[in-house]
Design a protein with these regions (language model features):
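Membrane-interface transmembrane helices that cradle and orient dolichyl/undecaprenyl
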Residues: 136-152, 181-185
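Transmembrane signal-anchor helices characteristic of membrane glycosylation enzymes that use polyprenol
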Residues: 8-36, 203-222
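Transmembrane-helix motifs of polytopic, lipid-linked glycan transferases
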Residues: 84-109
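Short acidic/glycine- and proline-prone juxtamembrane loop motifs at membrane-interface regions
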Residues: 123-130
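Transmembrane and membrane-interface helices of multi-pass
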Residues: 106-118, 132, 136
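Short hydrophobic/aromatic helix or loop-helix immediately within or flanking a transmembrane segment
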Residues: 40-88
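Perimembrane helix-loop-helix junctions
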Residues: 2-4, 141, 169-207
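Membrane-interface alpha helices of multi-pass inner-membrane proteins
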Residues: 21-23, 117-121, 136-137, 149-175
Length: 227
């Protein structure tokens, strides 16, 4: 209890700053693993988004994180740009958790310096940080007093295009959205006609992307090593 009391005397803002400082040092000292470098090279060698889409297909991962990596290569053709992008997304996730989560102060601090937020979702340049950020955003949206079906639908669509682990979570948010929609009794209480039009457009684009992605996966020939 004495240790917990001493920790509680330090402001959460200070702990967040400490988290940011330690993780940015870790980013600069981290040597990319093979799977991280593979994702970087795929994005770097792609001449356009369509080529990126085709080159990413054999990995089996959705396109969102490779697209962010591709944007990072346009900013600076050095892997550090991807690592800084990863750090920025992790920093935003950490801020949202510290600022808006309902947990006790000590629990927030322990979470920040836990294995996943500190190492796996921050120092390793992989898809998981986008998954973390979208989950936090989705949790904020579904618990908000002013429920936004449009924003929640966007989060669900992005989760489906992030990682296989996000599909179950996306379905959870989708069920919450359907429940909230049914509880309203009248769709006009949740969304305007303009928003409904945008939802239809986003839904069509989303399903087109799914079809194109899986067509690219099916048409990609993976070379088998000869023995």
């Amino acid at each position: 209890m004495l240790f917990a009391n001493k920790i509680s005397l330090i402001r959460l803002r200070t702990w967040l700053i400490l988290y940011l400082v330690l993780t940015i040092i870790g980013v600069y000292r981290h040597v990319l693993w093979r799977d991280e470098m593979q994702g970087w090279l795929v994005a770097l060698q792609s001449q356009n988004i369509f080529e990126l889409w085709s080159a990413n297909a054999p990995s089996g991962h959705p396109i969102l994180y490779p697209l962010l990596t591709y944007i990072a290569t346009l900013i600076h053709p050095n892997p550090i740009s991807m690592q800084l992008m990863q750090w920025l997304l992790a920093a935003i996730s950490a801020f949202l958790f510290v600022r808006y989560s309902p947990f006790a102060k000590l629990h927030k601090i322990l979470f920040l310096f836990g294995y996943f937020p500190f190492w796996e979702y921050c120092l390793l340049s992989r898809h998981y940080v986008v998954l973390e950020l979208l989950v936090f955003c989705g949790a904020m949206l579904v618990t908000s007093k002013e429920f936004s079906l449009l924003l929640t639908s966007i989060v669900v669509a992005l989760l489906f295009n992030t990682h296989a682990l996000g599909w179950g979570i996306a379905n959870g948010f989708l069920c919450v959205s359907v429940f909230a929609f049914s509880q309203a009794g009248n769709s006009r209480k949740l969304i305007s006609s303009t928003q409904r039009s945008w939802i239809k457009i986003c839904a069509v684009i989303f399903y087109i992307l799914i079809v194109v992605y899986y067509v690219a996966v099916c048409n990609t020939q993976v070379t088998q090593p000869t023995t």
